[in-house]
UniProtKB/Swiss-Prot annotation:
Subunit structure, interactors included: Binds ribosomal protein uS19.
InterPro entries reported for this sequence: PRC_barrel-like_sf, PRC_RimM, RimM, RimM_N, RimM_N_sf, Transl_B-barrel_sf
UniProt protein name: Ribosome maturation factor RimM
Domain PRC barrel residue range list: 93-167
Free-text domain note: The PRC barrel domain binds ribosomal protein uS19.
GO molecular function, one term: ribosome binding
Origin species: Lactobacillus acidophilus (strain ATCC 700396 / NCK56 / N2 / NCFM)
Function: An accessory protein needed during the final step in the assembly of 30S ribosomal subunit, possibly for assembly of the head region. Essential for efficient processing of 16S rRNA. May be needed both before and after RbfA during the maturation of 16S rRNA. It has affinity for free ribosomal 30S subunits but not for 70S ribosomes.
Biological process terms in GO annotation: ribosomal small subunit biogenesis; rRNA processing
GO cellular component, one term: ribosome
UniProt cross-references to Pfam families, sorted A to Z: PRC_RimM, RimM
Keywords annotated in UniProt: Chaperone, Cytoplasm, Ribosome biogenesis, rRNA processing
Disulfide bonds: none
Amino acid sequence: MQYFDVARILTTHGLHGEVKVNVITDFPEDRFAEGMQLELKDDIDRVLTIKKSRPFKQFWLLQFDEITDIDEAEKLRGKILVISEKDRGELPDGVYYYKDIFDCGVIDNETGKRLGKITDIQSPGANDIWLVHEDNGKEYWIPNIADVVKKIDIADKKVYVELMEGLRDED
């Protein structure tokens, strides 16, 4: 079974087993909902059930049914929380998990020519940007906007694009 990272436990918070986590998901409200079960990446058999959760600055605070004091919580420091593929859930049409976009071939929508592959994704503002790595070693960022990204074919691992002038160095 495949597992997906949703948070990294940074530190304890308070005396009753609460932990502060760095979020690694676009869906923290769903992933950290009361009753949701998470597992530890390095100990998949250990299930932790969310007792309560809340946003805290740029982090989240989580409390688990199974962790009741600071000493138990301290042992979780640095651990990665994951969900199984079955718990990942379905996304609406046109919305994709990052892992599905990584390593997709980038294809010129007009010519059908392969331009490279997506090797990184960043979320700096209103839309994501994707790093295209060409076979010749050149790299450039493209925005994930309708004017540029024309079609995403997850089954074939291909993204069809129409590059605006200036996005790709032609020298």
